[in-house]
Amino acid sequence: MSRAPRTAKGETARAEPARHVPVLLAEVLAALALDRPGLAVDGTFGAGGYTRALLESGPDMRVIAIDRDPTAIRAGADLVEGAGGRLRLVQGRFGDLDTLLADQGEAQADWVVLDIGVSSMQLDEAHRGFSFRQDGPLDMRMGGEGPSAADLVNGEEESTLADILYHFGEERRSRAVARAIVEARRRAPIATTAQLADLIAGVVRPEPGSPIHPATRSFQGLRIAVNDELGELVRGLHAAERVLKPGGRLAVVTFHSLEDRIVKQFFSARSGRAAQASRHLPGVERPAPKSFRLVTKGPVLPSEAETEVNPRARSAKLRAGERTDGPAPPPLSAIETLASLPAPQGRGTRR
């Protein structure tokens, strides 16, 4: 999803919204190696930055762009009109991209790009409830369906809230935050982002000199839980593996350590760098066909110049792989486990 350009002070740069530059754009295009006509899939359309760059890579490039957010699909209408039939916008989840492609009459793709997480448009619209910097309803749903963040905050048990904040948000004070939430909601429901942010700020003290808001990690954890973002990532990796042609490339940009760990383990296992555990014999490692060749040997990070212009890019990491002609193995249970809340005994150290 396209992240809006930012000045060093965090204010939106003067640019047309349609021309938002995605994070690591040049690096993603280089990793994809767009050297021939073909079909590219942008699994996370957002503001259309990657899609636009894919279309501009050559006159014969065709693109199918996917987004679960109906607002993003509507906003992309002008881009579709200007693409001369080379762009199709599809509302749906990128975890279903193989099914969505089949619905479009396409069995395979040459390239897939996934930009994981919340988009600039979602963060910058207060009524969507993603940002602790703007007051709005506590929603956080990317597609508008299912339980909202308010439903989780006001309805989940304290222990479950603590697990969400710790595992998905990496908030070390998750138990204290969960306890404060439960105590506050006994008095009145927590309905807005400002209410929740103020509550968290009273529990989590920022480190001296840190630019990170005390509510950052808790909001991240809730957002990931509301949208099942890690489960969607796991499904998207496997779906991309199924649709890519031999020689096709997959590029994935992540912004969270657990997201990156999932992508790293996926490429490591599928390229033969790590053994893949057998589903039928848990704990038994077995060789598996290599379905990917690594394009990036480690994570590609944004340049200092990019992070100065766009502070949101500072945690971005890019990993990419090239599809071999080997069959797609069964889904990796190890990364499916990473995408789920751990068992109680695996919660780790929290306060």
UniProtKB/Swiss-Prot annotation:
The UniProt record lists the keyword S-adenosyl-L-methionine: yes
Spans annotated as Disordered: 298-351
Catalysed reactions listed for this entry: cytidine(1402) in 16S rRNA + S-adenosyl-L-methionine = N(4)-methylcytidine(1402) in 16S rRNA + S-adenosyl-L-homocysteine + H(+)
Principal location: cytoplasm
Annotated localization: Cytoplasm
Gene3D superfamilies in UniProt: Putative methyltransferase TM0872, insert domain, Vaccinia Virus protein VP39
UniProt KW keywords: Cytoplasm, Methyltransferase, rRNA processing, S-adenosyl-L-methionine, Transferase
Binding site for S-adenosyl-L-methionine: G48, G49, Y50, D67, F94, D115, Q122
Documented EC number(s): 2.1.1.199
GO cellular component terms, semicolon-separated: cytoplasm
Biological process annotations from GO: rRNA base methylation
Keyword Manganese recorded: no
Enzyme class: transferase
MF-aspect GO terms: rRNA (cytosine-N4-)-methyltransferase activity
Alphabetized InterPro entries for the sequence: RsmH, SAM-dep_MeTrfase_MraW_recog, SAM-dependent_MTases_sf
Protein function: Specifically methylates the N4 position of cytidine in position 1402 (C1402) of 16S rRNA.
Entry similarity comment: Belongs to the methyltransferase superfamily. RsmH family.
PANTHER family attached to this UniProt entry: 12S RRNA N4-METHYLCYTIDINE METHYLTRANSFERASE, S-ADENOSYL-METHYLTRANSFERASE MRAW
Protein name listed in UniProt: Ribosomal RNA small subunit methyltransferase H
